[in-house]
Amino acid sequence: MNWNKGGPGTKRGFGFGGFAITPGKKEEPKLSQQSHSAFGTAGSSAAFAKSGPPQLPSFYKIGSKRANFDEENAYFEDEEEDNSNVDLPYIPAENSPTRQQFNSKSADSDSDDDPLEAFMAEVEDQAARDMKRLEDKDKEKKNAKGIRDDIEEEDDQEAYFRYMAENPTAGVVQEEEEDNLEYDSDGNPIAPSKKIIDPLPPIDHSEIEYPPFEKNFYDEHEEITSLTPQQVVELRHKLNLRVSGAAPPRPGSSFARFGFDEQLMHQIRKSEYTQPTPIQCQGVPVAMSGRDMIGIAKTGSGKTAAFIWPMLIHIMDQKELEPGDGPIAVIVCPTRELCQQIHSECKRFGKAYNLRSVAVYGGGSMWEQAKALQEGAEIVVCTPGRLIDHVKKKATNLQRVTYLVFDEADRMFDMGFEYQVRSIASHVRPDRQTLLFSATFRKKIEKLARDILIDPIRVVQGDIGEANEDVTQIVEIFPSGPSKWNWLTRRLVEFTSSGSVLLFVTKKANAEELANNLKQEDHNLGLLHGDMDQSERNKVISEFKKKGIPILVATDVAARGLDIPSIKTVINYDVARDIDTHTHRIGRTGRAGEKGVAYTLLTPKDSNFAGDLVRNLEGANQHVSKELLDLAMQNPWFRKSRFKGGKGKKPNIGGGGLGYRERPGLGSESSDRGNNNSVMSNYEAYKPSSGAMGDRLTAMKAAFQSQYKSHFVAASLNNQKTGSSAAGASGWTSAGSLNSVPTSSAQQNAANPDSPIAATAAAKGVPGFTSTGTLSSVPTFPSVGVQGYSNNSSANASAGNREGVGSAGSAPRGGSSGGGGGGIVRERYSDNRNSRHNEVPRRGEGGGRYNDVQHHGEGGGRYSDAYRHGEGRHGDSHRHAEGRHFTDTGGGNRNNVDGRNISEGRSNESRNGENRKDANSRDNKTDGFAVPEPPKRKKSRWDS
């Protein structure tokens, strides 16, 4: 900072503006022309600020903003001065060191303003700081002493627990999928859509040259050959076998007659087989003969061994496998468990010939199965889908297959494997040998199976789908579901003491719930259902076979093919979806002749299944409790189709319709079955209630066929009780109608003084007559002098009139015309023994349902007309008319007694008409046409 002494052209003071040292007139400092100081302006301003009123200095004209000293702007003076100080940049003088430094800094600032370089600089700084921090940590660890890393560091278990604590929802995806499962109307889970397995493409076998092979190895034993056809039939009947097909081989009754070699016989004896089962007796000769077969037998009957033993002989006759060859025998089954079980049987018997077997099923390792197939195996036990996958991936081929077996074929068709099964069969050479085995075989599925067989022999042991008689079935009925749980917990310890217990549940969710509840009761058990991993399923089944766990809770996935001899009790906690599944369920016990017990727990809502269960029990000669039968009777289809027990029903001899006592529940207030006092003791005269409704006959039949049509009161003077059968008082019938009004011949009843009808007829003058017309043909009662008349509304019998009707001018079948002397005709309304008119409750001597009854009219009984004094069923008892002779030559011709003519003095035998005539009968005359004018009668309630 320079000091200016003042002088011409220069101001006195420092370079920043100067101020007066001594009081007096202020002088403006004079700026040096040679140098420029930054303090000049500030100094000048400060000097002026300390002095009196502001004045405009002369040096303030260069490079500065002129200050506003107006009074109105005095308020903003300080702010503007501050702004002026801030806004004015510092510019050093040219060629000064400060200017040079300023220029160099501005150049540096221009380079630092690049944003990318600034960002990279920050990144590098942060990285440097991080590296330094890591180095510090490493130094701290190196300096630390006495610390074990294996304790301080996190091991696998701690890492797992930490992960589960941080992720509590890990592994819950499966449960969510289970909740999304859909169920059908029966409550069975609908399997989620899996990978669709396309069938194998078609193949043209004509382009492939197959080597010849032999498939008939059966040399019939001489003892079997010596049997006569009758003895063969008796042997099959003894074994409960039904064989159909072209020239089936004869059955063998022992292993020695099968022609097995010593190696196989040794293995069979080692497996503790003593005698072949019935299906083996017939199935082994058929399979060894090279014939295609359909084998149907109950569960546990030895079907597996029946096709494994001939298969081994079939394989040993062919040349050994070469590298790249496929199997010789293929066994296809529906489930993984059955696949593994058959595979173990094949290994057991196949080791006698060093034959290799491979199990190929879904859920197993694809790579391991493919490797085993490529190494070569004579026997492949598989499920359809996985075999197709391996064939498509060239892991194996079916060119050498000559022995093809479908076990549980109906189950595969039911599961939707029909196209896969057909494609597998179409890929095997056409001249193969094919065998189908199952416990049940429906007609539709059997037709599908016959399409892949050639001239098959069908072997049925027992009834198709019947239950095993070695299994004792016990049905328990409970009022509700919780009652089943109480019963199970109370009896389960008892069941486990006798052997392993298999509990079947329909739904997978119910199986898990039941298993959890039993575990809370401290029961050791296993769980098996379709959604479990294959390794878990294998582990559970293995433990159950080894008796490691005494109880297994399973769905129907374990219902087929599971062969565990230790199972002594099967409990159907939930009923099966159909009777075939029930048959397979209970077949898990009682295997190979062993005895077992199967419990089925029912509730009232299971009435639909109860009907099938009743028939299943009856087919297996099992006891059917009354409670179960009552529950089954709640099902309408079972109640309608159930056979009717009790005594057989007698035919309806009288006309159907009016004249029958009303059935209880169909209009009558009470049943008179227990009361032997007839209401006919009260009536005063005949009151037949037939109205003029001939044109409405069809409507009357439909509307009133099962209801009471008319009431009659006794025409007796002394109110005597009338019986239910006496031949003298025959009833008249309005043929074709619903009415049956009893009448009587006066002379006929007069001949029998013991009959109360005689007195009634004598008093009232009632002859017998026949009306074969409509309801309008109403009988009236002329004097006794009139012998009888017959009124035919039609030329012959009407639609309801049966053969042999004694009508005037028409001769009945087997006899002369019934015109004239008291022709009494009975017509049956219908020859159907089961018609609703026949099912009328009656009361008679026996008091039973089918005994004779007294109706509201003389002779209104079904089989007789007055007192019955004998044992004749159709009113053919001893009669008190003179010289009467009748013989029923029809025997069982009970429905053809409609047109019965009974006349005095005629004796005739007719098989159908049963015309009865007295010895005093007159010849056929035309006086039957002389119908007297009927007197007026009281109006009936049926008259329109």
UniProtKB/Swiss-Prot annotation:
Could you tell me the Gene Ontology terms of the biological process aspect for this record?
protein localization; regulation of apoptotic process; U2-type prespliceosome assembly
For this protein, the record's InterPro entries field holds: DEAD/DEAH_box_helicase_dom, Helicase_ATP-bd, Helicase_C-like, P-loop_NTPase, RNA-helicase_DEAD-box_CS, RNA_helicase_DEAD_Q_motif
Coiled-coil parts of chain: 120-157
Q: Does the keyword Cytoplasm apply?
A: yes
Q: Where is this region: Disordered?
A: 1-119, 131-155, 182-203, 642-682, 723-753, 794-944
Q: Where is this motif: DEAD box?
A: 407-410
Signal sequence, start to end = none
The residue ranges flagged as biased composition, category Polar residues, are 738-752
Return the Pfam families for the record.
DEAD, Helicase_C
Q: What is this protein called?
A: ATP-dependent RNA helicase DDX42
The domain of life for this entry's organism is Eukaryota
> What is the stated purpose of this protein?
ATP-dependent RNA helicase that binds to partially double-stranded RNAs (dsRNAs) in order to unwind RNA secondary structures. Unwinding is promoted in the presence of single-strand binding proteins. Also mediates RNA duplex formation thereby displacing the single-strand RNA binding protein. ATP and ADP modulate its activity: ATP binding and hydrolysis by DDX42 triggers RNA strand separation, whereas the ADP-bound form of the protein triggers annealing of complementary RNA strands.
Q: Which GO terms describe its molecular function?
A: ATP binding; ATP hydrolysis activity; RNA binding; RNA helicase activity
Concerning its family, UniProt says: Belongs to the DEAD box helicase family. DDX42 subfamily.
Record keywords:
ATP-binding, Coiled coil, Cytoplasm, Helicase, Hydrolase, Nucleotide-binding, Nucleus, RNA-binding
Q: Low complexity bias: where? A: 35-52, 723-737, 794-814
Skewed-composition ranges (Basic and acidic residues): 131-149, 825-887, 901-926
Which residues hold ATP? 297-304
Where in the cell?
Cytoplasm; Nucleus
**Where is this chain compositionally biased, Acidic residues type?**
70-84
Q: What organism is this sequence from?
A: Gallus gallus (Chicken)
